[in-house]
Amino acid sequence: MQINNQSRDVFYVSDGTAITCETLGHVVLGQFPFIPNEKTFPFVESQDKVADVVKEIETSYQRNGVKPLVFFSIVVPGVREMLLEAPAYSYDVLESIVQKVQDDIQMAPAPKLQRSRSVGKDSDTYFDRIAAIEYTLAHDDGITLKGLEQADIILLGVSRSGKTPTSLYMAMQFGLRVVNYPFIAEDVKMMRLLPEFEVHRHKLFGLTITPERLNEIRENRLSGSDYASEEQCKLELDTVEALFRREAIPYINTSSLSVEEISTRILERAGMKRRLFG
């Protein structure tokens, strides 16, 4: 992970899944104009595990000359103390909120490992989430168009417009079954809505992006290619947006939005409700 004026190393560390750390971290970092180089460490429940994390943090500091940012949620005192000794700017994502609730309700918290929650206790929620994730992964990037009747929403857009991360976030956080389908360069010559989507028009939602941002993203992946050229990016976007307008498919521009914001706006625009919370 290299440091420059537009990037910084960020670590998410938790004794649970780290989803809370990532979610809150993304919201906070979205307020700052730099690109986070992120790494996540879930289920850090022992001093041995946190020692490995500390080594990574130390390596980042030594390599870049600046302290990385660490968003964490750790219950075990010994593990927490070891993490706080690392050369980083560390932020407990729950501490200030828990303290405020404690002050307001005059009740001491009883911290416990996030992992200790029983699957059986929330089995319906757990299996709904797993089913949504499995469905979404199976329908990522146009892998298959079978089973569209089970989809909650179908995301359309050019390659690298944010469909995959948005799909997975909606599955993981909201328990929604999401299909995402990419329009590729060959589609531009005869852009049309696939017959498979006709009966599911009410589920269609488009993602678009500015040509400049798309060019930047594609250059990082395939620098100097026709695929990444400004001309190709603009051509694809103009063609796809024309399709969205012609077919009355709602869409949003993802250029300056976080995955969390994209997902929430889709729910709002599509009039959908979350199946799960958190």
Swiss-Prot record:
UniProt enzyme class: transferase
Record's keyword terms, sorted: Kinase, Nucleotide-binding, Serine/threonine-protein kinase, Transferase
Catalytic reactions on record: [pyruvate, water dikinase] + ADP = [pyruvate, water dikinase]-phosphate + AMP + H(+); [pyruvate, water dikinase]-phosphate + phosphate + H(+) = [pyruvate, water dikinase] + diphosphate
Entry EC no(s): 2.7.11.33, 2.7.4.28
Molecular-function GO terms, alphabetical: ADP binding; ATP binding; phosphotransferase activity, phosphate group as acceptor; protein serine/threonine kinase activity
Superkingdom classification of source: Bacteria
Binding site for ADP: G157, V158, S159, R160, S161, G162, K163, T164
Summary of the function given for this chain in its UniProt record: Bifunctional serine/threonine kinase and phosphorylase involved in the regulation of the phosphoenolpyruvate synthase (PEPS) by catalyzing its phosphorylation/dephosphorylation.
HAMAP family per the UniProt record, alphabetical: PSRP
Family statement: Belongs to the pyruvate, phosphate/water dikinase regulatory protein family. PSRP subfamily.
Protein name as it appears in the record: Putative phosphoenolpyruvate synthase regulatory protein
Organism expressing this protein natively: Vibrio parahaemolyticus serotype O3:K6 (strain RIMD 2210633)
